[in-house]
Amino acid sequence: MMSISLNLTMAFLLALAGVLIYRSHLMSTLLCLEGMMLSLFILMALLISHFHMFSASMAPLILLVFSACEAGVGLALLVKTSNNYGNDYVQNLNLLQC
């Protein structure tokens, strides 16, 4: 169990580093966010089953639902941005620019 949770924590940190490094393109940022959410989902499900906390068994499912909603909104934003500007740069999403 320890090596699995360590691997999932490393996957989360790697995806977080990916968000920080590849933050110029929206598609790369969305992929890294999805990796973070999936590693959190698996880690939460494993911890709940390991510690026999079945009263909190709905939490991973709720996290997965929010992850799907985040992916849908992100892809809609990606399509809208690429149609308007022709690229997927995050700097195009800054509403404070003229």
Curated annotation (Swiss-Prot):
Molecular function per GO? NADH dehydrogenase (ubiquinone) activity
Which terms are listed as keywords in the entry?
Electron transport, Membrane, Mitochondrion, Mitochondrion inner membrane, NAD, Respiratory chain, Translocase, Transmembrane, Transmembrane helix, Transport, Ubiquinone
Give a yes or no for keyword Transmembrane in this entry.
yes
The reaction(s) catalysed by this protein are: a ubiquinone + NADH + 5 H(+)(in) = a ubiquinol + NAD(+) + 4 H(+)(out)
Per the record, the GO terms for biological process are:
ATP synthesis coupled electron transport
**Is Endoplasmic reticulum among the key words of this record?**
no
Q: Which chain regions cross the lipid bilayer?
A: 1-21, 28-48, 59-79
- Tell me what topology the record assigns in the membrane: Multi-pass membrane protein
Q: What EC number(s) does this enzyme carry?
A: 7.1.1.2
**Enzyme class, broadest EC rank:** translocase
Q: What family classification does the UniProt entry report for this protein?
A: Belongs to the complex I subunit 4L family.
Protein name per Swiss-Prot or TrEMBL:
NADH-ubiquinone oxidoreductase chain 4L
